[in-house]
Design a protein with these regions (language model features):
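Compositionally biased, proline/threonine/alanine/serine-rich low-complexity intrinsically disordered stretches
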Residues: 1-41, 285-307
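Active-site beta->alpha N-cap acidic-glycine motif
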Residues: 40-149, 159-168, 175-176, 250, ...
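C-terminal domain-boundary segment and adjacent tail
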Residues: 72-75, 118, 244-307
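Alpha-helical scaffold elements lining the catalytic groove of polysaccharide deacetylases
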Residues: 93, 140-171, 185-231, 244
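Short low-complexity, flexible loop/linker segments enriched in glycine and/or proline
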Residues: 124-127, 149-152, 217-220, 277-281
Length: 307
């Protein structure tokens, strides 16, 4: 049985209603940091799911979420899920994920890699413009539990903070005070550092392991089997993966048929960047001239003779 939330758990919730009510908040959030309203309009997309709730999280002191690692806060009701996507933004796949979500009037949390956002800022902006939550997944997705980061906390902090600065620059505005560690490895010293920064750490309840899969059917089967077992949860997928992007429309359809509901999580306050790392990012941009992109994302064969 999941423990009951303590008083410090998320408190402000927006419900799915048919329309606005007197005094309802109407302000929209800054890019990457949506502001919850007092209600959620019904989905106007044919067959779309629509959001069930928006949950605002007070990240003071760096709470942890996701029962795979953190047991204290259980804010989801039966058959509720939070959709999270790691490792974007990425061409083709991230836009396909965005379309599937838009077709269902849903919002998700994107834990983006800072370096990827510098390569594809236009896609990061699309994620923010659609009202999704943007959060950091480090600068270059290094496992911070391994050396050199495990033995050099300053280098590990740089990997965290450069990711935050890069996302902030890519979307030209604030992002949420959420963070997910690469490989879900949580060094205690870095958890303490995030707590000092008032950044919440997200693990998962349902890990799709979609990075091991090449077919959309495999992704769907993995998620649904685990969801049926647990009944609810924070779901980890990757918008970097083509199979996931291809699977999402059918997966959302199965969610709806199964009576599952999607919750959008937002942070009460955006994360602030640190000037030291903003300056490091600016200096790196001047020196790198984007030469760090992988060959496959730069050079494409578009024609060759038949043999």
């Amino acid at each position: 049985m999941s423990p009951a939330p303590s008083p410090a758990a998320p408190e402000r919730v927006a419900q799915n209603t048919a329309g606005p009510t007197p005094g309802a908040a109407t302000a929209t959030g800054a890019p990457g940091q949506p502001a919850p309203t007092d209600n959620i309009a019904l989905c106007d997309k044919p067959g779309g799911m629509g959001l069930s709730r928006i949950v605002e999280i007070d990240t003071t002191g760096g709470p942890g979420f996701g029962f795979e690692h953190f047991k204290q806060y259980d804010f989801l009701r039966d058959k509720e899920v939070v959709l999270t996507f790691d490792d974007g933004p990425w061409p083709e796949n991230t836009p396909a994920v965005l379309k599937a979500l838009a077709d269902n009037c849903l919002k998700a949390t994107f834990f983006e890699i800072g370096e990827h956002a510098t390569w594809h800022p236009e896609i990061a902006k699309q994620v923010a413009a659609a009202g999704h939550t943007i959060a950091s997944h480090t600068w270059s997705r290094k496992d911070l539990a391994k050396n050199p980061y495990a033995s050099d906390i300053e280098q590990a902090k740089q990997e965290i903070e450069m990711g935050i600065s890069a996302l902030h620059a890519a979307v030209a505005g604030p992002i949420s005070s959420f963070f997910r560690f690469p490989a879900l490895q949580h060094p205690p010293a870095l958890l303490s550092y995030l707590a000092e920064r008032n950044i919440a750490t997200f693990s998962t309840d349902i890990d799709s392991f979609d990075f091991k899969m090449h077919k959309p059917e495999q992704v769907i089967d993995s998620v649904m089997r685990k969801l049926e077992k647990h009944g609810k949860g924070i779901i980890l997928m990757h918008d970097f993966q083509r199979a996931t992007a291809q699977a999402l429309p059918e997966l959302l359809h199965q969610f709806k048929d199964g009576g599952y509901k999607v919750v959008h999580v937002v942070s009460r306050s955006p994360v602030t960047t640190l000037s030291k790392y903003d300056e490091m990012l600016a200096q790196q941009d001047k020196l790198s001239v984007n030469n760090s992109r992988p060959l496959s994302s730069v050079v494409h064969t578009i024609g060759q003779p038949d043999h």
